[in-house]
Amino acid sequence: MTIKLELLEAALRNALGDQLQSLTQALGEVTIVVKSHDYASAMRVLRDHADLRFEEMIDLCGVDYSTYGDGLWEGPRFAVVSHLLSIKHNWRVRVRVFAADDEMPVVASMIDIWATANWYEREAFDFFGILFEGHNDLRRILTDYGFIGHPFRKDFPVSGYVEMRYDPEQKRVIYQPVTIDPRENVPRVIREEQYGAK
């Protein structure tokens, strides 16, 4: 571990204290996990604490862990992962928070702390169905307003439920049930002995 990462780890442990559920360092990156009820206060500490000063939220996304590790995952299904940047210290940190309820995943909104969280949270809501408590404009951002479901959930069918097409008789776009016939894909086997030889 480099001295820079050691300093970051010590500063995170000191500033967050009991709010820090876990801290891991892999591939030159630090990832922390906080509990959902500590999420808002921990993120405010990350931004405001003099030893940290994570002024920028670079990214925020949702994660569905339902099939993680070949389905051996035992923890909560949904998580929100944020990437923060401290310009002052030239540090980056990944913050993970798990939603307590798998049926209706809810975590606190970060728009009061970082304005950039607005569209990131809308995207996580649109694709994963994660609700952000305190977000004042939580609506779909990339899928159609009439879209049913959340397409990045692992249980969402790859083909979707409906498809759109232009109907020349009605002179408008219409929805109809998916007309793709299910098929079974046979994996292609490549023998390594003579692969690519001429």
UniProtKB/Swiss-Prot annotation:
GO cellular component, one term: plasma membrane
Reaction catalysed by this enzyme: a quinone + NADH + 5 H(+)(in) = a quinol + NAD(+) + 4 H(+)(out)
Assigned EC number: 7.1.1.-
Organism superkingdom: Bacteria
Lipid biosynthesis in keyword set: no
Disulfide bonds: none
GO MF annotations, alphabetized: NADH dehydrogenase (ubiquinone) activity; NADH:ubiquinone reductase (non-electrogenic) activity; quinone binding
Alphabetized UniProt keyword annotations: Cell inner membrane, Cell membrane, Membrane, NAD, Quinone, Translocase, Transport, Ubiquinone
Chief localisation class: membrane
UniProt enzyme class: translocase
Subcellular location: Cell inner membrane
Keyword Translocase: yes
NCBIfam families in alphabetical order: NuoC_fam, PRK06074.1-1
Protein task: NDH-1 shuttles electrons from NADH, via FMN and iron-sulfur (Fe-S) centers, to quinones in the respiratory chain. The immediate electron acceptor for the enzyme in this species is believed to be ubiquinone. Couples the redox reaction to proton translocation (for every two electrons transferred, four hydrogen ions are translocated across the cytoplasmic membrane), and thus conserves the redox energy in a proton gradient.
Assembly information from the UniProt record: NDH-1 is composed of 14 different subunits. Subunits NuoB, C, D, E, F, and G constitute the peripheral sector of the complex.
Annotated protein name in UniProt: NADH-quinone oxidoreductase subunit C
